[in-house]
Every structure is written in structure tokens, then in C-alpha cells.
From Swiss-Prot:
Compartments where located: Cytoplasm, Cytosol; Membrane; Cytoplasmic vesicle, Secretory vesicle, Chromaffin granule membrane; Melanosome
A GO cellular component entry from the record: membrane
Gene3D superfamilies on file: DnaJ domain
Keyword Transmembrane helix: no
Pfam families, sorted: DnaJ
Primary role: May have an important role in presynaptic function. May be involved in calcium-dependent neurotransmitter release at nerve endings.
GO BP terms in the entry: chaperone-mediated protein folding; regulation of synaptic vesicle cycle
Gene name of this polypeptide: dnajc5
Ranges for domain J: 13-82
Membrane-topology descriptor: Lipid-anchor
Positions with biased composition (Polar residues): 174-189
Record carries keyword Hydrolase: no
Record protein name field: DnaJ homolog subfamily C member 5
Main location: cytoplasm
Length: 195
């Protein structure tokens, strides 16, 4: 444990292993035995006049719940109680990702990329503005029609001229409503008729 830095401990400041009186390499059977012994000693029913025993019992239960769950124990062994807090907030499968992204080199990489792209301004230009307002836009393949901008006024004028060419063919009457019924019988073909 000399190469690993000291992690934050339980809420009382003691390691969960110390709460149960165990070594970090304790087996699940050792954890169970120690928990039972301490739970009997500090159970609130056996110590009704001692509120400290009740608090100690809660800590023992918490330590037992974490150390008997293999995933939580692994997280606790690697990252301490901060790892357990992160597991509660983001899920047990995202703990490693959280600590990788919160490392100094990930933050430095993010800052470096921000600096070389002008606070990510270049990325916005490439994605949103098609690089230099379309000047660097890729050319369409041979044989395809080139896209161009048409102003709304030109479109309006074209629509007016098309309507004048077609003549006075405007529809001025609403369609009448129609009802349809279906008769399905087992001995005949379905027939559709309006009433």
C-alpha cells in the first residue's frame, strides 16, 4: 500500500476494515464472523440506554454491507469511500471512467485541445459553418447538379408566374363529406359502399 495514496475513510474517519476489526486481506468468512460478533455486542436491543452503541451498530452494518458485496469491496479497496460515493451517483460501472476523466492528464488534454482550437471555436466552424462559410466545402461529384441559394423573393416571383401560366384554375369549393360502411360476412365477399 506504499505506492497507493491514502484514500478517504468512512464517515467516522475509520477504515471499514478497522470498524470490523479486520485486515484488508480478510476472507468473506472472516468478515461474516467479525460482523456477527460485533453486531451482537452493539445491537440496540442489548444496549437500550447507550445511543453510541446504536451509532456503532449502524457503522458495523454499513461496513458489512460494503465488504460482503464483491463489486463494492473492489471499488472501496481501489478508491475508498469517495469511490463508493461516485458509484452511488454515477453507477458502479462508471467509477473507473470518472476517475480517469478527473485525473490531471485528462484535464490537461482537454485544456490543450481547447487552446489549440481557440476554445474549440475551430470545431464549431467546421461543424456548423462548413469551414470558412462554405469556401472549403467539398465539390460535388461530376454529373450532379450544383446546389445554389435562391432568395425567397425569387421563389415568390416564380410561383406567381407559374400561376399566371396555368390560368384561372383555382379551386373555390370545399369537397363534400363522404361516409363509408363495410359489410363483412363469412359467406360473401366484402363490399364497400357509401350511404
Amino acid at each position: 500500500m506504499g505506492d497507493q495514496r491514502q484514500r478517504s475513510l468512512s464517515t467516522s474517519g475509520d477504515s471499514l476494515y478497522i470498524v470490523l476489526g479486520l485486515d484488508k486481506n480478510a476472507s468473506p468468512e472472516d468478515i461474516k464472523k467479525s460482523y456477527r460478533k460485533l453486531a451482537l455486542k452493539y445491537h440496540p436491543d442489548k444496549n437500550p440506554d447507550n445511543p453510541e452503541a446504536s451509532e456503532k451498530f449502524k457503522e458495523i452494518n454499513n461496513a458489512h454491507a460494503i465488504l460482503t458485496d464483491a463489486t463494492k469491496r473492489n471499488i472501496y479497496d481501489k478508491y475508498g469511500s469517495l469511490g463508493l460515493y461516485v458509484a452511488e451517483q454515477f453507477g458502479e460501472e462508471n467509477v473507473n471512467t470518472y476517475f480517469v476523466l478527473s485525473s490531471w492528464w485528462a484535464k490537461a488534454l482537454f485544456v490543450f485541445c481547447g487552446v489549440i482550437t481557440g476554445c474549440y471555436f475551430c470545431c464549431c466552424l467546421c461543424c456548423c459553418c462548413n469551414c470558412c462559410c462554405g469556401k472549403c466545402k467539398p465539390k460535388p461529384p461530376e454529373g450532379e447538379e450544383q446546389e445554389y441559394y435562391v432568395s425567397p423573393e425569387d421563389l415568390e416571383a416564380q410561383l406567381q408566374s407559374d400561376m399566371e401560366k396555368e390560368g384561372d384554375g383555382a379551386i373555390v369549393v370545399q369537397p363534400t363529406s363522404a361516409t363509408e360502411t363495410t359489410q363483412l360476412t363469412s359467406d360473401s365477399h366484402p363490399s364497400y359502399h357509401t350511404e
